[in-house]
């Protein structure tokens, strides 16, 4: 199976075109050769017509091309009529997506008024009880028939009204039926979506796209790769468009890094027709990050140099860290083998940050690049390595994007029968992140980039390679601020699931279903818990998708009703209807009860 033509050359996947709305009146065509489309979601209560109209207009004004609105009930779905009318009255014809969970009847109402209906195969026709049950083939076939009966009316109505569908699977909300047959796996996510796609095709309806969202970027990447490979297996006319997103990415740097790893990796491989960066922030921030991320992809992917070898040097459908020997390239520094992925810094960064770092700090440089015996190799040329115990990297100045260069390095080492540990770099042009083709033509000096762009580029490059299982140490040089460079390295490792040095938060982006102010609550929870290294806390705005979407979180804070919070351990609700004013401290109590609490240390000067 293959999900792209080559791991070394960017060639956009040729998807079929689907039409959303009337292109002559503000609608849009996605797929084919059309540019990748930016989508976001408003946070307003769907019954607040004026608020929904205003938020939508604000998004459109900054470049959002598709706007999603939640429709949790038939009443909410019916009010989409008024929202759409308000937008059209103001001359705004942006396509609207109705977000549906659990309620086929809400979907049937929404399809009357909006251009797209998003359904989640995990909960459109199935309930979620986390129940174990073995299905015979006959029982499974009967369940598929039941789903067909529930989903077919929507398909027929979409076809009649010339609407579009998004079949959007979420890792945290797979049905019990899928879980019991395929497990909590990328294969389960893909097969769940294909079941719904087959029903669409039974009725000769093809105006739909797929999404495969997960809060873990590695899982998300595997899912999309597997989906595209499975579509290829099904046949050439299964080339439906793909919507990319990392769900519950959170806010701030962490949300941007997770999204850049997941979305950026796939865009660099030529996948994706629409994208959304899901942040626990005001929706316009999502659009800004989408724009910035899309602008980096041509600079980070190889679309110029054809590389004859197209063999994958890693398994694209199953994450496994590349096997390397453990080595000690300098005194008191080990990497490779079973060691964690190490953080290396330049001598200049070391000299600036080490005076402010204590031995017990989790964020600290672990080696100086100039002190290591690193073999700098050009993977575009022949080379020899005499020992597996030599730490290697790609030489600066190689005229390839970093992702391509490091993948090619792994392929060449593999052909030589070598499995040397690899040090990853965020760029191949020295300190100051500036790809070769962007340098000034006159004096070849690098132009400093904005920190937000450095963050996205480093996350895409390093994160993509880590998701491939490549890398035993990393070096971030693109960020000129030494302290920020060090923090960025650790944040990328945590977002990629390679190291844990702080609390991990799985936080849904706010929407009309949210029962509390997510940004405020997230800040309060972080203030009390951000020192809990290795603990994962989910913060979910509502009960509709909360328990399932918490994925592998240790604890959950979920809106149960207006002003009331339910607390979870894993996916099990433990405390119910806690007043919101007490809920954060009750969460702390719950963490203490399960022996995951440690007292925070006194604040010290942070790295700068």
Language-model features, listed with the residues they occupy:
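Catalytic alpha/beta core domains of metabolic enzymes, predominantly
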Residues: 135-151, 156, 178-305, 311-335, ...
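N-terminal active-site wall of soluble small-molecule enzyme domains
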Residues: 71-113, 351-355
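Active-site mouth loops of central-metabolism enzymes
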Residues: 14, 33-51, 70, 95-103, ...
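Conserved, mostly hydrophobic/aromatic
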Residues: 38, 99, 167, 210, ...
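Glycine-rich, proline-tolerant flexible connector loops at the mouths of alpha/beta enzymes
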Residues: 43, 62-87, 121-142, 208-217, ...
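Glycine-rich phosphate-binding active-site loops on the catalytic face of alpha/beta enzymes
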Residues: 63-68, 114-131, 268-284, 392, ...
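Hydrophobic or amphipathic alpha-helical targeting/insertion segments
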Residues: 93-131, 137-157, 162
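N-terminal amphipathic alpha-helix/helix-capping segment at the start of soluble metabolic enzymes
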Residues: 1-41, 46, 155-161, 299-302, ...
